[in-house]
Every structure is written in structure tokens, then in C-alpha cells.
Swiss-Prot record:
PANTHER family: FLAGELLAR L-RING PROTEIN (PTHR34933:SF3). Disulfide bonds: none annotated. Keywords: Bacterial flagellum, Cell outer membrane, Lipoprotein, Membrane, Palmitate, Plasmid, Signal. Assembles around the rod to form the L-ring and probably protects the motor/basal body from shearing forces during rotation. Residues 1-18 form the signal peptide. It comes from the Bacteria. This is Flagellar L-ring protein. InterPro entries: Flag_Lring. Belongs to the FlgH family. GO terms for biological process: bacterial-type flagellum-dependent cell motility. It comes from Ralstonia nicotianae (strain ATCC BAA-1114 / GMI1000) (Ralstonia solanacearum).
Length: 229
């Protein structure tokens, strides 16, 4: 009975440790992913028989020569994500050391030199260490997402953030993006490259059986965490 209790306790501890070893990843895109434009202050309208005044901030009027690119809270910008990163590192080291020493006992008190030779002492040592290491990583991220201006900074830069979700089969995929856009980098198509966005944060996450298949099993994670090798 005691053995069964110990086995049950060990199994429970194993499951608890395995469940706690891999916490869900923390999001890197912080804050809201959208914003609505503020309501304009409506001044009393002076409408005549032909002329009908429309508030410029209501979205019903835009000047003929007004810039159509995003510049206010609530405006949208299309981000073209084209991220290509590659990094590699290689190190090597070598240490070699050797030494030897021999001590002999001279003839003493007429003793046989053959006997004295047995009392000679010699020692030698050698130490050698070689190490090599190399690692590399390559990442490609290509996507398109339309984000919303959530804040206009004092210098005119635009803080943008957005999210796009897609339900594919039995899983869900989501793309999140946030950063600071310089309005001068926005082209006439109201798009900007992700490489021109400051403080860019990009996420691509998924749920479902495809995402679960990419994760290591809990038992494998447990043995990997306790293995000394």
C-alpha cells in the first residue's frame, strides 16, 4: 500500500513538474491593437439653400488637395513585412601543456648502484584541451497587415498597432504588429515597409493540432530538464 502511495505521489509530482516547465510565450506586442478616432467638436452649421456645410473631421469631407496618407488617430496604414535575418558565430580554442621531471639517488655508503637506481623518481604529465563551437540562425518573415494609428507623438511620428486573425481548418493563426512610423516614409499608396518602422514588434502565432505537433511532449521535456548531459 505504501509503495502505491509513493508511486502515485511521484506520478503527480512528475505531471506537475512537466506542466510547469513550458509556460505559454509572452506576447511582445503590448497595448491596444486598434483605436477609434476622437469625435470632432461640432460647431453650429450655417447651411444655406445650396451650400451644406460638412465637418472636416467627420469623414464626410476631405479637401481636393488634402493628403490621403494616414496622419491622425484612427487612420490606417498598410505594413509590408519583409524581414530577413541571418546570423552565425564560430569559436575555437586549444590549450596544450606538458612537463617531466626525473630525480636519481647517488651512490651512498658503498651501496650497490643497481639498488640505488631503484630509488630513482621520475614523473611526467601532459594536458591538452581542444574546443570548437558554431551556431547559426536564418529567419524569413513575409506578410502584409493593415494597422491603425493609435497615437500621434509630439514630433509627428505615428504609433501604430494592429492584429489579423485567420481561422484555417482546425486552427487559428494570428499576426500582430506594432511600432513607430515616420510619416515621411509612407508612400502615396499609404504603405510602408517594416524595415522602416522603429521599435517594430511582430508576432506570428498559431493554435490547433498543427501548432501542437510542433511542441515537444511533456514527458520528453521532463527528461530533458533533469538530464545532466
Amino acid at each position: 500500500m505504501r509503495i502505491l502511495r509513493l508511486a502515485a505521489l511521484g506520478t503527480a509530482s512528475l505531471l506537475a513538474a512537466a506542466c510547469g516547465m513550458l509556460p505559454p510565450p509572452e506576447p511582445i506586442v503590448q497595448g491596444p491593437t486598434t483605436a477609434r478616432p476622437p469625435m470632432p467638436v461640432m460647431a453650429p452649421r450655417q447651411n444655406g439653400a445650396i451650400y451644406q456645410e460638412v465637418a472636416s473631421g467627420s469623414g464626410g469631407f476631405r479637401g481636393m488637395f488634402e493628403d490621403r496618407r494616414a496622419h491622425m488617430v484612427g487612420d490606417t496604414i498598410t505594413i509590408v513585412i519583409t524581414e530577413n535575418t541571418a546570423a552565425s558565430k564560430q569559436t575555437s580554442g586549444s590549450v596544450d601543456r606538458s612537463g617531466s621531471k626525473t630525480t636519481s639517488v647517488p651512490t651512498f655508503a658503498g651501496m650497490n648502484p643497481g639498488v640505488l637506481s631503484l630509488l630513482g623518481v621520475s614523473a611526467s604529465d601532459a594536458n591538452k584541451f581542444d574546443s570548437k563551437g558554431a551556431n547559426g540562425a536564418t529567419n524569413n518573415f513575409t506578410a502584409t497587415i493593415t494597422v491603425t494609428v493609435v497615437e500621434v507623438l509630439s514630433n509627428g511620428n505615428l504609433v501604430v498597432s494592429g492584429e489579423k486573425q485567420m481561422a484555417v481548418g482546425q486552427g487559428t493563426e494570428s499576426i500582430k504588429f506594432s511600432g513607430v512610423v515616420n510619416p515621411t516614409t509612407v508612400n502615396n499608396q499609404n504603405t510602408v515597409l517594416s524595415t522602416q518602422v522603429a521599435d517594430a514588434r511582430m508576432e506570428y502565432r498559431g493554435t490547433g493540432y498543427v501548432a501542437e505537433a510542433q511542441q515537444m511532449g511533456w514527458l520528453s521535456r521532463f527528461f530533458l530538464s533533469v538530464s545532466p548531459f
